[in-house]
Amino acid sequence: MAYNLKQTLNKEERLSPGHRMCAGCGATIAVRNVLRGLHKEDEAVITCATGCLEVSSFMYPYTAWKDSFIHNAFENAGATCSGVEAAYRALKKKGKVKNTHKFITFGGDGGTYDIGFQSLSGAMERNHDMVYVCYDNGAYMNTGIQRSSATPMYADTTTTPVGSESDGKAQNRKDLTQVIAAHNIPYVAQTTFVQNFKDLHTKSEKAIYTEGAAFLNVMAPCPRGWRYNTPDILEICQLAVDTCFWPLFEVIDGKWIVNYVPKKKLPIEDFLRPQGRFKHLFKPGKEELIARIQAEVDRKWEELLSKAK
């Protein structure tokens, strides 16, 4: 069926309003739009790693989730979901479960790139019929904006503070999407909030209805941690893809597909400048730092294009 934005947006919300997420939070936007990939007749079981999303949307006895929701611990959301999915298959085989259920895990970059990576990797390698969705906001935002392995190089965080002896985080960010693609699972995709959400909506539905393991990495900007003007979130996302900092691509059964090639690739400073976490890079004498970021972005972009040939 051809994509229809109006029909997609008119689907019933599966995440209720009234939760405690910050105004303009990218994680909430990601969740609402991923869940729009579910067909109306299907139920979902959601597992969630500890993080902004979990502590703000589920505080017993209150929940913003209309589907079944499980929070276990920070590090084991992938294992929890794979266990529930395995139990469902066993019960379905015995005829004890009639309805169709889909299994979705949400985790931030801290619970996905770092603390929960081993349970994510295991679930993907075993090819459980589930979707792991990382809402990547580039740091441990819930506990005070500490750096994670998803934090970009030279970002100012509370554990990589900028000062006379530091220019922020010294390391490049981990390319987790490619790491998961190396697990040879049926579907891997990277996306964010662009194209009236068409890219996110279509990839979410593909991931949810792919047989076997699927992984979505969604760049979900955090106005508090990134220090940009809150209403500018969609502009920030568009700059991320137009500078090729956050390319849009899929890996379907091992085939690499680039979904968006900018007509005019913008310089990386266009993405960095609106964010307070990078303001130190625009002081005199810091030009070389921006050049290093640009060189890494260019290298990764060319590497991606070569994989998609």
Map each language-model feature to its residues:
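Short, well-ordered beta-to-alpha junction loops that form the rim of enzyme active sites
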Residues: 49-51, 218-221
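Electropositive phosphate-/nucleotide-binding environments in soluble metabolic enzymes
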Residues: 12, 24-28, 74-78, 170, ...
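Active-site lining segments that contact anionic ligands and/or coordinate catalytic metals
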Residues: 211-215, 246
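Short, conserved beta-strand edge motifs with alternating hydrophobic and charged residues
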Residues: 134, 188-192, 215-219
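Conserved thiamine diphosphate
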Residues: 8-11, 18, 99, 149-209
